[in-house]
Amino acid sequence: MAMIIALQARQILDSRGNPTVEVEALLDDGSFGRAAVPSGASTGEFEAVERRDGDKKVYQGKGVLDAVHAVDEELEQVVVGLDASDQRAVDQAMLELDGTDNKAKLGANAILGASMAIARAAASSADLPLYKYLGGPNAHVLPVPMMNILNGGSHADSNVDIQEFMIAPIGAPTFSEALRWGVEVYHSLKSVLKDRGLSTGLGDEGGFAPNLESNAAALDLILEAIDKAGYKPGRDIALALDVASSEFFDKGTYTFEGKKRSAEEMSAYFADLVEKYPLVSIEDPLDEDDWKGWATLTEHIGDKVQLVGDDLFVTNPERLARGIQEGVANALLVKVNQIGSLTETFDAVELAQRNGYRCMISHRSGETEDTTIADIAVAVNAGQIKTGAPARSERVAKYNQLLRIEEELGDAATYAGASAFPRFAAK
C-alpha cells in the first residue's frame, strides 16, 4: 500500500494551442504518475464544468491557472495520506471537496487530472501496466480503431454538416493489421482528394476537411478510397458517423443540408443511409435532449446499426440510466473529461455493459500526448476506440500505445473486429 504524498499541477498546451491541466502525483514509495486533461470543441450541455480563468488578456480567457491552483492548494490537501490504490476513495474525497453535481467549484479538469495521475502512480507502484492495473487480468481485448478520416461540422470549415466520417477496419485479424488497413485507406483518400482538386488540409482530429456538396458525397469518397486501397467496403472496412446534431438543432428543428427537418425526417434520413452504406455506428444522430426522437430512432434502426450517445449521455451514469430505462440508443461514448473522474467513468462503463450497451472510448478534439484512454479501452475490453485519424502526434500516440499493449499481451491479445458490432450484418 503506497500513500499519496504530493500533487503538483501545471498549465500546458493542448493540440489546438489552448491551455490545459497537467498533474503529477508522487507516492511515499517513490512511485510517480503524470496525466494531462483533454478538451472538447463540440461539448454537451450536461458535461462536467471545465474551469477556465476568463481573463481575456491571457490566452483569450482560456487559461487554466485557477484549476492548477485548485489541484495544488485544495485537492492535494484531501488526498495526501490516502492509499493511492483505492481509486474510489481518492476520487470520492475530491468530489466531496468540490461538493457540486457538475464539478463547477474546482473544475473537472482539475479533478480528472489528479484522478488520472494518481492512477498512473498507483500502477507504477504495483509494477503493472496501466491497462492491467485498471482492468485486472482479464483485460485483453484490443479495440477497433474508429478512424476519423474526413471532418465536417465544427471540426472543419466546410459545408458538410456531419462532424466525423470514420472507417472501422472490422475484418482485420489483429489490431496492428487494422491500424495498417486504416492508414492505407487514409493515404488512399488523400490521393482521391488530390485527383479531384479538393483540399487535403486537416481538421482538428487529423482528418481531411474538403469542401464537399453533401454528406453523401463524403461517404462516396471514402468508399472510393477503400476500394482504391484494395479493401472491400462492409466486409473489410465499415463506415461510422458522428453527426453531433446538437450543433445544428434549435427550437425543435434540425437545420441539416440546408433544410429544416423534424426528428422524424432526420430518422428517415439515417434509416436510408443505413440501407445504402455499410454503416456500423452513428453517434449523436439527434439532439442531446430529444429523448422522444431518440427512442423512436432506436426502435426503428437500433437492430441494424449501433446508435451511440455522446452529448446525450455525457458519460454520466444518471443520464445513461434514463436512456436504458427509456430504450434510447444502444451504445455509450466514453469521454473521461465529460464526467471528470476515473471512478465515475468506470461506473458509467459498468452500467452500460451490464445492460447490453456497447462502449466506445473516445478522445476529444483538444488532445495531448497523454495515452490514458488507450489503456482504458483495453482495461474495460471496450472493443472500440475513437481517437482520430492516423495523423497528428496527439492522435497517433494512442494508436502507438495500443500497438505496445498488443505486443505485451502476445497470444493473450484478442482483436474485437466485427464482434464489436453484433447488430451489423455485412451486406
Curated annotation (Swiss-Prot):
Cellular-component GO terms for this entry: cell surface; extracellular region; phosphopyruvate hydratase complex
Keyword Flavoprotein: no
Major subcellular site: cytoplasm
Cofactor note: Binds a second Mg(2+) ion via substrate during catalysis.
Functional note: Catalyzes the reversible conversion of 2-phosphoglycerate (2-PG) into phosphoenolpyruvate (PEP). It is essential for the degradation of carbohydrates via glycolysis.
InterPro entries: Enolase (IPR000941), Enolase-like_C_sf (IPR036849), Enolase-like_N (IPR029017), Enolase_C (IPR020810), Enolase_CS (IPR020809), Enolase_N (IPR020811)
Family membership noted in the UniProt record: Belongs to the enolase family.
SMART domains recorded: Enolase_C, Enolase_N
UniProt protein name: Enolase
Alphabetically ordered keywords of this record: Cytoplasm, Glycolysis, Lyase, Magnesium, Metal-binding, Secreted
NCBIfam families documented for this protein: eno (TIGR01060)
Gene Ontology molecular function: any one: magnesium ion binding
Catalytic residue list: 205, 335
Residues that, per the record, bind Mg(2+): 242, 283, 310
